[in-house]
């Protein structure tokens, strides 16, 4: 696996290899004495990966076990868990191999290690793309269920959901292979950043519109019950808090990584940008944290899923 300065995490090639279409080079030692670098120990990476691995395996197992959860919405949540599971597996695998190599327990040729690193890079990149796609799919599914409630079951059918899921996985794998193969082209980085911005905008527009509709519905109920002010304010605050958490977690966990990719194109030699480049490991750790938080936001809030999860933990299959 490529060792580039202090950064030895997945997608390291995107971190320090400049785009070939522009004469860009990253200057590793021009960040100045006040540059803050957050060191992420391998043990922490391994711990985060294992926690995420256990969480998302439980989500997949619970949805697979309970037939009441075999619906398009839960299939999207299950696929999101599988995407996060790939992030966890890739992280655990890479960290374990790195620790074994550093300890001298595992001895292999550099070419083999490089091939393993390429495979892991494809896994992590495809999991990132698919995770973003399924987050968007969940938002669209919820939007349709609110604004087209009467037509929901005719619009979001199981065959259609399966086709969407298959298309997302195929597109994610192709995108990851192309991204890793042509990582040194500016257009690849810009496409990845543009994809993130598009998904962020899609989720923000849909969830804000859903919140506005929910508040409007709450006001209507309040007027009928002649208790407009207390109900509306309480519901609006709760909805705004939920929306802030949902979009805030998404932006905080994914934003720094895609900011990093943007700066590789915009200012690869600027000292300030160099400070940001030095924290690449931190940005990847935040993505793993997102894989831990996703089940808490999208899966474990379901009472039916929590009940099934208890049965899974008790091994009562």
Swiss-Prot record:
Job of this protein: Receptor for MSH (alpha, beta and gamma) and ACTH. The activity of this receptor is mediated by G proteins which activate adenylate cyclase. Mediates melanogenesis, the production of eumelanin (black/brown) and phaeomelanin (red/yellow), via regulation of cAMP signaling in melanocytes.
Topology, Extracellular side: 1-37, 94-118, 184-191, 267-279
Stretch forming the signal peptide: none
Gene (name only): MC1R
Mode of membrane association: Multi-pass membrane protein
Source organism of the structure: Ovis aries (Sheep)
Family assignment from sequence similarity: Belongs to the G-protein coupled receptor 1 family.
Stated name of the protein: Melanocyte-stimulating hormone receptor
Gene Ontology biological process terms in this record: adenylate cyclase-activating G protein-coupled receptor signaling pathway; intracellular signal transduction; melanin biosynthetic process; negative regulation of tumor necrosis factor production; phospholipase C-activating G protein-coupled receptor signaling pathway; positive regulation of cAMP/PKA signal transduction; positive regulation of transcription by RNA polymerase II; sensory perception of pain
Gene Ontology MF annotations: melanocyte-stimulating hormone receptor activity; ubiquitin protein ligase binding
Keywords for the protein's UniProt record, in alphabetical order: Cell membrane, G-protein coupled receptor, Glycoprotein, Lipoprotein, Membrane, Palmitate, Receptor, Transducer, Transmembrane, Transmembrane helix
Residues bearing attached sugar chains per UniProt: 29
Stretches assigned to the Cytoplasmic side: 64-72, 141-163, 212-240, 301-317
InterPro entries attached to this UniProt entry: GPCR_Rhodpsn (IPR000276), GPCR_Rhodpsn_7TM (IPR017452), Melcrt_ACTH_rcpt (IPR001671), MSH_rcpt (IPR000761)
Subcellular location field: Cell membrane
TM stretches of this protein: 38-63, 73-93, 119-140, 164-183, 192-211, 241-266, 280-300
